[in-house]
Amino acid sequence: MTRKKADSANKKPTPKKATPPVAEKAAPATVKKEAAPKKAAPVEEKAAPAAAKKEAAPKKAAPVEEKASPATAKKEATPKKAAPVEEKAVPAAEAPAPVEVMAHQPRRSVAFIGSECYPFVKTGGLGDVMYALPRELVRLNCDVRVILPRYACIPKEYQDKMVYRGEFYMDLGRTGRNYYVGIMEYIHDGVVYDFIDNQEFFSTGNPYINLVDDIPKYCFFSKAALAALNYMNWIPDIVHCHDWQAALVPVFLKTLFQSSPVGKAKSILTIHNLRFQGIYNIPTIQYWTGLPDSVFVMGALKQGYEDANMLKGGLAYADRITTVSGTYAQEIQTKEYGEGLENHLWYHSQKLRGIVNGIDYGMWNPETDPSLVENYSLGNVLDHKMANKLALQKELGLEEDEGKFVIGLISRLTNQKGLDLVSAVIPQVMDGNTQVVILGTGDREFEDTFRYYEGAYKGQFAACIQYDESRAHRIYAGADALLVPSRFEPCGLTQLNAMHYGTLPIVRETGGLKDTVEPYNDFTGDGNGFTFDRYESGLLLDAINRAKTLYFTNRYHWDEVVQRDMDKDVSWENSAKQYKELYLELTQW
């Protein structure tokens, strides 16, 4: 599209739709739904030597005794209430907001189980997915519930809107106790959010503390989530769980809950970041789960000689495994990216697939974004994006010059995000025609380095050592390019946000970055960003220089790439359709 055509456009165009590792020796076979196997555990792989010494059962977390008699595993699957609850006395839940539903789509019911969800509690990308994907699935005629812990840190404005739905007691592992499980409900945009309440486990401020506290917490949560579905008599077709905190759900489904109503559901486990796996000693996890010895084998939960790996167990028992990009799905089957599970994932590769995340256009949209000084769309980006650039320069104390090339970086300041490469190339990047804006917090080493550069390049370098959501929006709108030079990146959302705001991404070819950014070709003009492959500072500098060369020597082609990026559909719609297809594939009838 030429500049002239772009300027005359009044409406945003309709978006376009757009040597394997050695196998483990006896990994589990998939359990068939119709079968009722006596032993739900996977076939044991070649056993590793037994633990040298047996650990003592861990101490309880000073619980307050609930009055209830011990329950068997079968009873807890359909738990009894501690006292009869009058259904008529339960207040009506908040009426769901009108949602456009594609009624022609086959209907499926899905329970999302995870440890965080925006806007209730969010520490990373998982919270965004748990919020945006269910909302999009509702449009595709899915009946969706999201099950979360009721953390004390959830803002009062949401706590006050929750409606009591009932309570029961549930035995837990080998603790010899029955634990209170309350259910509080909140409905928003057609999605039902059910919060599992137990102050003994969820009273601390931060959802993630340390493994000593988190292992019991998420053993309880995973079991309570399934027991709550039985209690509410809401049996989903699919249980879709996320990361290690909910990875025991597929294990519970095919063992302790197999003969209960919820045991009929199919399970999907999504890996958002393989680095975090929930690894602890076997006696502790046996103590808190009560799972049979048959699951603590090398093909399932057992790892090494003495440890259990909650994520590994979930991968073995889940009917399907997904991760957040196709390239990452391949990478995690290699030693470089597999975090010790590459053989296990290769063995289960027939049930593994990658589905790229999307972004929520309701939150990330330059046409309606209230944080911007001037809103803009595909049709007028060439006129109005510059105003946001000048406003960003003024806000951050940079030299106000529309001719400068502004590079943004919005990230956790850690090695995983490639900040060591960025630190190394800054002196070569700062050539008098370039400005750099950093937003984020993280390792002290990088925070101090970027503060130093801010002092060394006054008026040209801004180090915002904080996370400010509103400022992030303004950087996406005001920068010309965005750096995402990650060492590894399962999916990445910042490059998608940048493209939607007409800011060209400069990324390393890994994970979701490789799947979403096509390198610009100087000869054909194809591509939507600038990339480099090997993790080397010189290659990052080369990618930055290629972007600067196009910007300063061929603005016509630069503007075409800006418009191409804004026209690219990076919404959740495509991702949700792929998940819906997966649900239908698992539940054919």
Model-derived segments and their meaning:
Residues 2, 8-9, 13-31, 35-43, ...:
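Low-complexity, polybasic segments enriched for Lys interleaved with small residues
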Residues 2-6, 11-12, 16-17, 81, ...:
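Catalytic cores of nucleotide-sugar-dependent glycosyltransferases that transfer UDP/GDP/TDP-activated
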